[in-house]
Amino acid sequence: TMQRRQFLQTSALATALLGGMPLSATAKSAKGKVVVIGGGYGGATAAKYLRMLSGNQLDVTLVEPNSTFVSCPMSNLVVGGIRKINEISTPYTGLTRNHGVKMVKDYVTAIDVEKRTVKLKNGKTLPYDKLVLSPGIDLQLDKIEGLAAANASGQILQAWKAGPETVGLRKQLEAMPDGGTYILNVPLAPYRCPPGPYERASMVANYFKQY
């Protein structure tokens, strides 16, 4: 099952970060500091299970610029009108309240591997014993002339990262006149979530069929 695979993956990660020591030995030793960069599926899951599998002995800090996790694989359901954005969103406060993960809402701008510190956009630094990198993707909007400006103005929305643009894209669909043309561009491979564009095209076609 997905839960079992997820548990095995995070168990392996925890074992690596704990230096291969048994959890019973780790629980008696001084706390180690782990900084996790990125609060997507990988980063949030790693932060949660590092706390759990260390008996809450590890000091885990998650650096993520957003205050809420939005499920990207479910976002096309929002575009298609089957779900609302709040139904696929989860605040990160649950990681702090339920698992003791420290949250830092910011971006990482530099990593000093010798000093074992990460520098934040606000100028502060965080020390670490172990570092987990899970920042996700970035968008190469400059690859198509004019796309960056059109995206910044809200004229062309990609919604490749689920969130405000997902809602914006849905609103654009609702505002389209009858007989209007919808254009969807599929990025050159390799790209994140290969089925994504085809799922979106299907959801949009279903919306047009109904309305």
Set out the residue ranges of the language-model regions.
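A conserved short coil-to-beta-strand element within the FAD-binding core of flavoproteins
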Residues: D106-E114
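Core beta-strand elements of the Rossmann-like FAD/NAD(P) dinucleotide-binding domain
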Residues: N122-K130
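Glycine-rich dinucleotide-binding loop and its adjacent helix/turn
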Residues: G136-Y211
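A short, basic/flexible loop-to-alpha-helix module at the beginning of a structural domain
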Residues: L17-A30
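Short, well-ordered coil/turn residues at beta-beta hairpins
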Residues: T10, S134-P135
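Beta1-alpha1 glycine-rich phosphate/pyrophosphate-binding loop at the start
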Residues: K28-K102, N151, L188-Y211
